[in-house]
Amino acid sequence: LLSYYENQIIGGALNFITNQNSCILFYNMIDYKYKDLQSASLQIYKSLEWAKQNGLRYLDIGVSQLYEGEKIIPHDSLINFKEQFGAKAMIRKVMKLKL
């Protein structure tokens, strides 16, 4: 999904279908020069619309945390932003592999 303003790409979202019921909005990117146009909000809305049209029940809009070393801290403003779309917070384990 790409967002345009005056024929210029100003944002995009990448969705992956993860199973028959859900997909994940894996990346929701914007060009910060155009942040006042709220393309991130539009991209979430369009992703929700697309998921519903394709028979999916859930759209995972990703994690909402900051990392300070090994410490994980909730990113309150991002959580609030996502809750405006009706999102419900869930805790999920994150696995990492040290190479």
Predicted regions and their residues:
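Generic hydrophobic alpha-helical scaffold/packing signal
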Residues: 13-14, 48, 79
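Short, contiguous acidic/charged loop-to-helix segments that flank catalytic cores in large enzymes
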Residues: 30-38, 67-73
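A conserved beta-strand-loop-helix scaffold within acyl/acetyltransferase catalytic domains
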Residues: 1-35, 97
